[in-house]
Amino acid sequence: MEQKFRVVKRSIDARQKQLKVHLTVLTDEHGAPLPKDAPIPLYEPPHFQDLHNAEHSVAIIGAGPAGLFAALTLIEHGIRPIIYERGKEVAERKKDIATLNRNQGLNAESNYCFGEGGAGTFSDGKLFSRSKKRGNMQRVMELFHHFGGDDRLLYEAHAHIGSDKLPTIIRRMRECILEHGGEIHFSTCVDEQLFRSLINNTTPSYTTLHHSTRLLGVILSIGHSAHDTYHMLHANSVALATKGFAMGVRAEHPQALINKLMYHDPSPELIHLVGNASYSLVTQVQGRGVYSFCMCPGGHIVPAGSALNSCVVNGMSASHRNSPYANSGMVVEIRPEDLLVNNNTTPHYTTLHHTTPALAGLRFQQELV
């Protein structure tokens, strides 16, 4: 039987004892069946251009989410992306992570932070943002769907891909970039020599450019753990500024406890229908925000450090979210003024460690981990 409607948004309201599932549906006003092969909801597929002979290129430093989506956007607009990524492609990266999980050693350039897809590849793929600087969030969902994501990405209020499915989606993004004339250089950390060649619009000798191309600019898409790159940028007079961030710990609980608290003694049938419960906590302590972050129902805690002799963790869930444990970051906001001495303009860590003011936050992180 053909469908008369399709779900375009789904959310769960667990604030009251009686659980409510809210659906927004798309239907023909005359009740006619909808096309079977139509995406849910309808969206314009991307139009990627063949750029093998493009005259203009842009260099992208980092193949995390920002770098990959920047590359795809450039291809849609007729500009050839050239990506430099310090880590490995996703299949090789998985091997290094498996070695780390067996306590057999950390590869400082290929781990839960560095490599194709960035930290997000092995960090769950929750597609939700509290930021008011949201941009075109729906287009992000559509592109993930285009590269193999589930239909639920297009209508779930808190969409989730899963760390088991993300590597395949990321690989397909890379294949698309290469197919349309882009370049990706793995195991290539942008050091001072390469950075200077890029900003001076000269081609490094070890790239594989097949023809002359004019470099229009450089997009920095590096992650928070690339401390060495930030220091290199500062040494090359790139303007940097201290910004606020959040730090904390990760708490783990039995998933059954969270289900009971959020769903009010749910039946196994209900859990099967709506999935394991998640939560969000926000409060103020002495005028400072404290909140849960990256809550992972049915998830795992993983070693997410990228440097030796440090302790950093993250959380992730597979697509089915069926681990017996839930976990969430519990973090507090760190403000730029927290790094100052006597509320003046001299960062505290500048005084103690001879650190430049713009990099004081990085030094603070290093002291804690």
Locate the predicted segments by residue:
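Residues forming the flavin
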Residues: 1-122, 126-207, 211-369
